[in-house]
Amino acid sequence: MKSYSSREVIAMLKADGWELVSTEGSHHQYKHPTKKGKVTVKHPCKDIPPKTLKSIAAQSGLAFQ
């Protein structure tokens, strides 16, 4: 799996319609107007661990290569 930075992941979420709803410390939470749940992304983070990317993919419905 390719390594992604938090900036890249956030850009993908925003492009898919996710909106920032909350920030607590270094954790940003995003909510989609039609999809269920929230997605939390640690920002800034140069390389998000693969297991975290899998979790973000499952929550958001996005595919990371």
Question: PLM ranges: what are they?
Answer:
Residues 1-24, 31, 35-65:
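Basic nucleic-acid-binding interfaces
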